[in-house]
Amino acid sequence: MESLVLLLLFLLIMGGFMFFASRRQRRSMQATIDLYNSLQPGDRVNTTSGLQATIIVVGDDTVDLEIAPGVVTTWMKLAIRDRILPDDAYMDEHEAEPGDFVYCDELEESDGSS
């Protein structure tokens, strides 16, 4: 009798774990679907490969992304990871100047090692 109670308790715990895991997965999937359905020309996006671009044309399964002025490439919608929100425009306000970066050669010279 005691082993039956333990088995039922174990099954109940496993069932609860599976329920909450699938619920979280469904919520994540719905957020991704909502993102793909809301893409519009002019949106700034990140791709899964880390590229930042501007959407030019939205098709059924593809998007045309402008990755540099006048350079447009076609990508699958599935390659879009997320939309760049206006709050993410920190770098637009604080553009880097060429002297702001330290290059590897400068690091080696400052350490005294060559």
Curated annotation (Swiss-Prot):
Membrane topology type: Single-pass membrane protein
UniProt keyword list: Cell membrane, Membrane, Protein transport, Translocation, Transmembrane, Transmembrane helix, Transport
Pfam families: YajC
TM region(s), chain numbering: 1-21
Principal cellular location given in the protein's record: membrane
Keyword Disulfide bond in annotation: no
Annotated localization: Cell membrane
Record has rRNA processing as a keyword: no
Entries under PANTHER family matching the protein: SEC TRANSLOCON ACCESSORY COMPLEX SUBUNIT YAJC
Assembly behavior: Part of the SecDF-YidC-YajC translocase complex. The SecDF-YidC-YajC translocase forms a supercomplex with SecYEG, called the holo-translocon (HTL).
Function text: The SecYEG-SecDF-YajC-YidC holo-translocon (HTL) protein secretase/insertase is a supercomplex required for protein secretion, insertion of proteins into membranes, and assembly of membrane protein complexes. While the SecYEG complex is essential for assembly of a number of proteins and complexes, the SecDF-YajC-YidC subcomplex facilitates these functions.
UniProt similarity note: Belongs to the YajC family.
Name of protein: Sec translocon accessory complex subunit YajC
Native source organism of the sequence: Mycobacterium leprae (strain TN)
